[in-house]
């Protein structure tokens, strides 16, 4: 007799085969799969809310650099979907699994029955329905492909059964579970830039007198910090960064010209205003990184490096766009020319940076009580371990920490909410699950913390030692 396994076992083995070692969920969902996951060594983190679970998965994915999984039953799907907004904006490969009543129960006023596709469509790269057992293996595999390729992002699978139990309890032939190891990390299947475009951009770099690199989220997603530093140093190009790429260069690096855009340092915006060539690296050129599209000046030559060709030149017509992986393209550009010196331009940039630091130092050293946020950021800068991960909420938390927290060690990393207040604390728990060996610090305020304060119990129960 042929050996059979449940759909729950297939789901558990498929997740493990793709490198998943944590799931974040709200009960009740895929209970058979959860039992099988325990046997396979997967930590099952039961949260206090669906949004908390999705934020934990998001934080985990960003730090672990591989897909993460969150789950909820049918009635919790709307809350889970709301929590994917930050993963979508942050290009984080979170795979959301929900249950839904079987087809025979739909459109008949069944208990807790609601179409889920409209809830997830605008927040995911793909939302698929697993109606039949035959679809399960293929759609699970496709979910990892969708989440990790191109511009990474969340994916949703709606699994038949109020708690996914119809598929979870179905029987399958026991055998090797389909998986694709290349989709266990992100970004998967990196693409280099076209040689003709590399030559064209190299010509612009050589001709420029005052170039600047604007490092954005794609640099962090692509793990391109080292490649960008080598590129900037070879051609003597200062670097400004969005909050999402704050970790690109250490604070004291002579080419670090600060945080640009709306939540910014004046010096960084001054550099972009003065530049004659602006290279957006890993950027979709959004409002925040351009200070509502007022940076750079009209007519300035723009180069845009981005993984999605549809985004190239969307907001600036004077753009030479190159699609592909930002790390690979920076590596190609770094060997395209001989080293270039720009002493006069770098001296001008250094003066902008020096003037800004002098202007904020009285606040960073203030003895006022209660302590000012600027002083808090200075104290935190000085005591952060060399390998610390800082996870910040949005709003003033990211304005203060993003601009006034100085990261002086290459191993230090900074991640912030893309816009959902309350994301910081659950995301920091997910980050700590991904790297329990590293110190994780959550920078948030009372309002942000109160959104998901109950997850303190989750942290205590699982010994997730986030600060």
Kindly give the residue locations of the regions a language model identified:
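Active-site diphosphate/adenylate-binding microenvironment
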Residues: 11-12, 16-19, 24-30, 35-36, ...
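A short, small-residue-rich loop immediately preceding and capping a beta-strand
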Residues: 21-25, 43-45, 63-101, 214-217, ...
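Phosphate/pyrophosphate-binding active-site segments
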Residues: 1-2, 134, 180-184, 199, ...
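Conformationally flexible catalytic loops at phosphate/diphosphate-handling active centers
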Residues: 142, 146-207
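Glycine-rich, acidic loop regions that bind phosphate or pyrophosphate groups
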Residues: 97-139, 245-348
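Glycine-rich, anion-gripping cofactor-binding loops and their flanking helix/strand elements
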Residues: 62, 217-303, 408-438, 452-454
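Thiamine diphosphate
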Residues: 97, 106-112, 274, 313-315, ...
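Glycine-rich phosphate/diphosphate-binding loops that line cofactor/substrate pockets in enzymes
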Residues: 9-20, 59-65, 88, 146-151, ...
